[in-house]
């Protein structure tokens, strides 16, 4: 994998579109950007200085600030996923931490809150509104202040068996979510899909197999691509999230989806760490990218040993204050063990006490993003 083909993927004016400032004169935008550039990380500042806003967009929204080969699997990671099926769970966890996760400099992106691009965006919008007596585009429809999006990845048979436990908690709190199933790992009954659709939930695809190899090479990705697209059609699914958030923004353009959520604003704990720094959705080529912005439940539970939604709620407060998208990914495979579901239940209860949020399914956010992108 490499960064080849990335140039031009976002289209022209991605930063201007994301910030909702297309109605302003380019000269005014340039002045506002110049005044806010110091808020960005050094690699993003260099990209802006060398290649303007198009360079900044690629550095941030396509993660080019981490290098042209950021998405390339290392030899150790390739080996790990070849032997992973034969390893016990504890050995997999140790190897994942020590071998698979590449080291990202501690000063690269902050976690769980990365506020530098957010501050940059807000500064540019504020300066333009103050100097030009015009309004920037709203972040969200109908006067909503921020967005709340709930998603689930079902990794295996245990998660499938306990999925309804999670969804029952959501329904009782008045929420609906998107559920991503692996294409070829376990049987997903048609009756379950019909029930989810009837209840107002969304269905998405969680890769072809949960073996870490969907993106291991271009040839294997292309081999699995037709089957993934076929499963998307069979399930009437519009969205995708890659297992283990392995990703390649160029290859993914061939997926028949309207949205993806394989990227994140910041996460040092994923096999490909880094992040797009954006707490808002944006168009990534032919689909809307909805980065998850709340810490992964696996990280909180298995890695950090958290027993409360404390970090989720801290990040939620930040996202609400900055009109962001609070997109959480919860796995029934993890939260339905050892009484952990109460952690998610408490989180949802706290969300209901917030004011002004837009509770939306990913497909609704994708539609809004496409509409806003063209405004």
Give the positions of each predicted feature.
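Conserved beta-strand positions
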Residues: 205, 242, 328-330
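Terminal accessory/targeting
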Residues: 1-180, 185-188, 233-234, 250-256, ...
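Acidic, His- and aromatic-enriched active-site or binding-groove loops in soluble protein domains
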Residues: 200-210, 257-273, 281-283
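Glycine-rich phosphate-binding "P-loop"
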Residues: 150-155, 203-219
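Short, solvent-exposed turn/loop segments enriched in Gly/Ser/Thr/Pro and often Arg
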Residues: 181-189, 238-248, 265-266
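Metal-dependent catalytic neighborhoods of phosphoester/phosphodiester hydrolases
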Residues: 191-192, 215-223, 251-253
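Conserved residues at the C-terminal ends of beta-strands
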Residues: 243, 263-265, 293, 331
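An active-site-proximal "capping" alpha-helix that borders the catalytic cofactor pocket
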Residues: 221-232
């Amino acid at each position: 994998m490499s960064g080849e083909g990335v140039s031009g993927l976002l289209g022209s004016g991605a930063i201007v579109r994301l910030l909702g400032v297309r109605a302003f004169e380019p000269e005014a935008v340039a002045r506002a950007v110049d005044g806010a550039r110091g808020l960005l990380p050094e690699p993003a500042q260099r990209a802006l200085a060398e290649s303007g806003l198009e360079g900044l967009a690629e550095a941030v929204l396509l993660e080019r600030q981490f290098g042209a080969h950021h998405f390339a699997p290392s030899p150790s990671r390739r080996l790990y996923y070849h032997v992973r099926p034969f390893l016990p769970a504890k050995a997999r966890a140790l190897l994942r931490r020590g071998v698979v996760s590449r080291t990202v400099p501690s000063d690269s992106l902050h976690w769980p809150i990365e506020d530098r691009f957010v501050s940059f965006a807000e500064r540019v919008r504020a300066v333009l509104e103050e100097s030009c007596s015009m309004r920037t585009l709203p972040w969200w429809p109908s006067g909503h202040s921020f967005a709340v999006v709930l998603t689930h990845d079902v990794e295996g048979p245990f998660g499938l068996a306990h999925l309804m436990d999670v969804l029952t908690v959501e329904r009782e709190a008045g929420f609906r979510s998107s559920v991503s199933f692996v294409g070829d790992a376990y049987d997903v009954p048609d009756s379950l899909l019909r029930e989810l659709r009837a209840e107002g939930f969304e269905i998405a695809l969680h890769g072809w197999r949960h073996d870490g190899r969907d993106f291991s090479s271009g040839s294997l990705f292309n081999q699995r691509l037709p089957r993934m697209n076929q499963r998307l059609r069979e399930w009437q699914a519009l969205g995708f999230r890659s297992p283990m958030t392995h990703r390649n923004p160029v290859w993914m353009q061939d997926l028949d989806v309207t949205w993806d959520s394989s990227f994140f604003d910041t996460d040092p704990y994923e096999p490909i760490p880094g992040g797009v720094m954006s707490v808002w959705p944006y168009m990534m080529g032919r689909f809307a990218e909805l980065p998850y912005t709340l810490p992964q439940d696996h990280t909180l539970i298995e890695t950090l040993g958290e027993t409360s939604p404390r970090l989720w709620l801290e990040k939620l407060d930040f996202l609400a204050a900055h009109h962001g998208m609070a997109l959480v990914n919860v796995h029934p495979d993890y939260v339905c063990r050892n009484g952990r579901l109460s952690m998610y239940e408490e989180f949802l209860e706290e969300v209901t006490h917030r004011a002004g949020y837009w509770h939306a399914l990913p497909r609704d956010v994708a539609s809004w993003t496409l509409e806003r992108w063209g405004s």
